[in-house]
Amino acid sequence: MDSAKTCVTKFKSFAILLFTPILMLPLVILIPDKFARCAYVIVIMAVYWCTDVIPVAVTSLLPVLLFPLLKVLDSKQVCIQYMKDTNMLFLGSLIVAVAVERWKLHKRVALRMLLFVGTKPSRLMLGFMFVTAFLSMWISNTAATAMMIPIVEAMLQQMIAANTAVEASLGTLELLDKNKTSELPGSQVVFEDPNVQEQEDEETKNMYKAMHLCVCYSASIGGTATLTGTGPNVVLLGQMQELFPDSKDVLNYASWFGFAFPNMVMMLVLAWLWLQCLYMRHNLKKTCICCGEKKRDTEKIAYKVLNEEYQKLGSLSYPECNVLFCFTLLVILWFSRDPGFMPGWLSFAWVEGNTVHITDATVAIFVAILLFIIPSQKPKFNFSSQTEEERKTPFYPPALLDWKVAQEKVPWDIVLLLGGGFAMAKGCETSGLSKWMAAQMEPLRLVKPAVITLILSCLVAMTTECTSNVATTTLFLPIFASMARSIGIHPLYVMIPCTMSASLAFMLPVATPPNAIVFAYGHLRVVDMMKTGLIMNFVGILSVFLSVNTWGRAMFNLDNFPDWANSTSVNT
């Protein structure tokens, strides 16, 4: 039976791999345009990504083959997409995360946080979500996720180990109590129900899925709260200044924060509830605050186990201090580079006109390089006090990180995954697929503004699953601005929801770097992300719609068509 099932699975994978390109050929044959050829490649990649018939990283390389072959892009245009600024930001962040993991700083932080928060999974998840979202407000979503995931991984391992020990202890005590009248002297029999064990394993897997998804989701959600928190927000600000120069300061750091921060909190709470219901519903009663005495005793034992593990780490070591310094330096430099509400250190010497010479990627690579330089041991400058053995060792101790460790620990396949997403976005732009999609929106002129907003938000949320969110907003916002002006509605009534919908990339690993980072840890399948992310997309779209139509109307005066929009010529 198992062999037959394996054969069917293999045949299914082979059939999808072979017949998907063949079945989609009419798209290229019947529509002899470049945008149709681009759509052909995107559909194939989407199917392969969703079904995992070949490795995700290999699917990401398809544009390098198919775009030049189908004359969508030449080879040089495609290949350059695989090592862009965002890829370097991602790589630098992961190298820092590897250093944190190597010296077990994440374990120390994880145990300390776990001791403070407790072992209730629901409380842990909510804490992770708000911390990650807060970080994403000020630093890049990619960096926040790359820094939080090792901590999440360590906390989960410690929590599962502690709870397993507690359950085994309580189970043994309960068994002894039930059998104390019939137990033979010096003997003890323990019976394990395989169904119970299977259920516990499934609950553990679900907890891993929920905890990892909550981090990448909250990173994407948290970035929406500030103008500089994520790329689409910055694109919106730039498009407003370019398309509507008379709008002056209608959209600034303070006004955006006042609108977007409450929406972020609402989305985080809804996301937490959805993840709890989907993956941890069996634990809802166990994790309730008002639980019984038995649960409180369990938590006491778990706390004792965790505290013992924490004590084993000893005091903060020299390499841990250096890694902590590098991590703190990274966060401070990211935050202070260009905070938005005040001039950052970037403006002192590295901005010339519209050219910005230093990005977050520069900072990430700088700190990553430091990790290969800063020593992991204290250098001894007093040669007279050194022993004979110490004199034989090199003067400068080994660095915090060496290339062998970095090469083994960094998930290089995810770099290709991100590059594939950028190549797809470039193909859409160059082939005219984005213009074709805009032409399909002409009938929306006859629809009510609220319905237009919902439809366009869904369109953007769908598009951003396959292309970068920055590219999506860059392509769509000028079109939406022109449409809003032509039908006489406030441009921000359409542009704000669509900008925020570009951050609702919850369904695919390639959709956004936080998803890719989480996916790299191996606890999730593409199907898991699609199942969870589909509802998250609807939750996000409806939350943004509610925000725009309540306090957003009052803040931006969305009920009235502004003079600055009427007097501006918008060119798409």
Swiss-Prot record:
It comes from the Eukaryota. This is Na(+)/citrate cotransporter. High-affinity sodium/citrate cotransporter that mediates citrate entry into cells, which is a critical participant of biochemical pathways. May function in various metabolic processes in which citrate has a critical role such as energy production (Krebs cycle), fatty acid synthesis, cholesterol synthesis, glycolysis, and gluconeogenesis. Transports citrate into the cell in a Na(+)-dependent manner, recognizing the trivalent form of citrate (physiological pH) rather than the divalent form. Keywords: Cell membrane, Glycoprotein, Ion transport, Membrane, Sodium, Sodium transport, Symport, Transmembrane, Transmembrane helix, Transport. InterPro entries: Na/sul_symport_CS, SLC13A/DASS. It comes from Mus musculus. Pfam families: Na_sulph_symp. Its main location: membrane. One of its GO terms (molecular function) is citrate transmembrane transporter activity. It is a multi-pass membrane protein. One of its GO terms (biological process) is succinate transport. Homodimer. It is found in: Cell membrane. Glycans are attached at N382, N566.
